[in-house]
Amino acid sequence: SSEPTSSSEPEPVHLPKNPLTGVEGLSEEAVGKRPVAVMINNIDEALPQYGIGSADILVEALVEGGITRLMAIYGDYTKIPNVCSIRSARYYYPLIALSFDAVYVHWGHETTYAEDVFQSYDITRICGDWNDGDLFDRDEARLDEGYAWEHTGYFKGPQLPAALKELGKRTDLDSAHQGMAFLFRDETAPAAPTGEGAQEVRVEY
């Protein structure tokens, strides 16, 4: 006679949770490691960007001239794709990155307040001006398509883990930033909706 078969389902495999999202999927290599914040262009002439869809947080803030710039924050430094187009820092972006103990990636910076912030707060940064870790290059396809030079710089995200080791950058999160970056509700006990219906939403800047 044949052996009886078990009808029980296998136990699900739980991956580590991403501290920036509270969602499972963080690689084992990234547990307890620092996130990475990358400066990205956000003007019409530089669109479309690429690599930002993999970011866990996108920070958009005004810079001079009424335009905005993005800072993409990736919780898993081993899974960052190539990102384009990379732009320069303004002083408030590295301060936001610092609040997550993130490694800060940029290509250039304004030399007044930003330089003071870098020095005063000992920001861990990787800069395209010096092509730190050979992590920066120009997108030849964009150049061929007629994009302006400043809109063609990209960051070689897949090469970052090896470059961080080569550059001697700290990769472990400091003690103040261990665990989840936010207070997340347990997925098995979602919060009940409260409040009143919103008929109109208006956002100004």
Where would I find each of the regions flagged by the language model?
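Gram-positive cell-envelope targeting signals
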Residues: 1-7
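A surface/extracellular/periplasmic glyco- and lipid-processing/surface-interacting theme
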Residues: 9-57, 64-205
